[in-house]
Amino acid sequence: SAWLDVNDSATVVSSKENFERFSSDVQQQLQQWSSNGFLHIKQHFSNQQVDDVNRAVDELIHQKHLPITHDNKVMYGYKHSPVIKQMMQDGGLKKLLSFILDKEVVPFQTLNFVKGSGQRAHSDSIHMTTYPLGYLIAAWIALEDIHPDSGPLFYYRGSHKLPYLLNDDFENYSTRLKLGNKQYSDY
């Protein structure tokens, strides 16, 4: 697992190289990583950047470059839009995520939601498993004002310390050429 999941972040993170480069708010949240498992960064991107990404997503949908999936997702927009790719590759965000993992992060996917997915509690690691375990990290970027009825992301504090559940734990065997046959509700 990543170093902040193995150690107590409250005692070790402040001595880590480059810790001082982060704002005091981010530093305080990093010290709580071991117990929380997430950071809440406000206004990392400007309103203009957010507006630009929203326009880019709308253009991709209207030009039919990327269809909206059955669950209101626009997947891999960064492959078709330099604006979305620029946000995904944001240097400050990558430095923070790399600091948390103590490895250089490699962004590999964007999901834009037309409206909140309303997805139930789940673990992303069952679908995107890293080897060794513990090196999956995500950034959820709100591109609109968030309220309880908008289908916002939720996270259970400390759930990053729970044992990993993998597809094999559900007898849902997949190969490179075949996906398993389990439904979402089976998980």
Language model features with spans:
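Short, charged/polar surface micro-motifs in flexible loops or helix N-caps
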Residues: 103, 116-118, 145-148, 161
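Short, conserved beta-strand element in jelly-roll/cupin
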Residues: 130-148
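Non-heme Fe(II)-dependent double-stranded beta-helix
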Residues: 1-123, 127-132, 168
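Double-stranded beta-helix
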Residues: 149-187
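Short C-terminal domain-edge/linker segments immediately following a structured domain
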Residues: 71-75, 118-119, 140-143, 168-176, ...
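Short, structured patches in soluble enzyme cores that scaffold and shape functional sites
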Residues: 112, 123-125, 141-145, 157
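Short beta-strand segments in beta-sandwich/barrel cores
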Residues: 39, 145, 153
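A general structural signal for short secondary-structure boundary/capping elements
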Residues: 87-88, 134, 182-187
